[in-house]
């Protein structure tokens, strides 16, 4: 457990640290209150709102609590204009065309995984059946509880989004949830 040095509220559009003025960007999706910062020299640090192409290529699923909000936050970055964007803790993008392509790639990644998960679903599957089919296709073979809990959390967030959008429907069969194409 830790104590925050400072709390940033949803309505805050900036913070001042030791006399330096930082803008605050609301970028929910990756996490509920995910934010980015604009440095005093104008660079936008967008954190995990965007990931680089290498991470996209290696990822089994996006790490996102709220897929719909994540898609909105990614798309909203198109309307911003900063001289540099710091992406997912490591890449710096200064070219607008490169940023636009990276946004497109991040959004396409989510929609590709959407199609794959829908392909994995056989109507009437339980959650356990569905995630098992996903893990088989993605060749996820871990016995480590922590690693699997991350896969399970990301899969759950994704299935919730598919349900919210009507692409999947859930029916109760006694004590089991069964999933069907919407």
Model-derived features: where do they sit?
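Active-site HxH/HxHxD metal-binding segment of metal-dependent hydrolases
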Residues: 1-17
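A structural motif corresponding to the C-terminal end of an alpha-helix
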Residues: 3-7, 76-81, 167
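Well-ordered beta-strand positions enriched in small/hydrophobic/aromatic, beta-favoring residues
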Residues: 15, 35-37, 179
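Charged, glycine-enriched surface loops/patches
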Residues: 17, 111-115
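Structural motif
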Residues: 18, 40, 171-174
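Metallo-beta-lactamase
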Residues: 21-28, 32-111
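C-terminal regulatory/interaction regions
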Residues: 116-182
């Amino acid at each position: 457990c830790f104590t925050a040095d400072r709390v940033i509220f949803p309505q805050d559009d900036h913070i001042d640290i030791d006399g330096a003025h930082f803008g605050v960007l609301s970028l929910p999706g990756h996490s509920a209150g995910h934010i980015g910062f604009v440095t005093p020299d104008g660079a936008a640090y967008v954190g995990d709102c965007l990931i680089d192409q290498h991470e996209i290529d290696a990822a089994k699923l996006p790490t996102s609590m709220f897929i719909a909000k994540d898609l909105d936050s990614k798309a909203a970055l198109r309307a911003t204009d900063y001289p540099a964007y710091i992406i997912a803790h490591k890449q710096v993008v200064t070219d607008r065309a490169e940023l636009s392509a990276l946004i497109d790639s991040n959004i396409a990644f989510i929609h590709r995984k959407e199609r794959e998960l829908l392909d994995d679903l056989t109507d009437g599957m339980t959650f356990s059946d569905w995630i098992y089919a996903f893990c088989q296709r993605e060749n996820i073979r871990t016995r480590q509880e922590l690693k699997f809990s991350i896969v399970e959390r990301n899969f759950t967030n994704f299935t919730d989004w598919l349900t919210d959008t009507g692409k999947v429907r859930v029916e109760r069969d006694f004590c089991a949830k069964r999933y069907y194409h919407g």
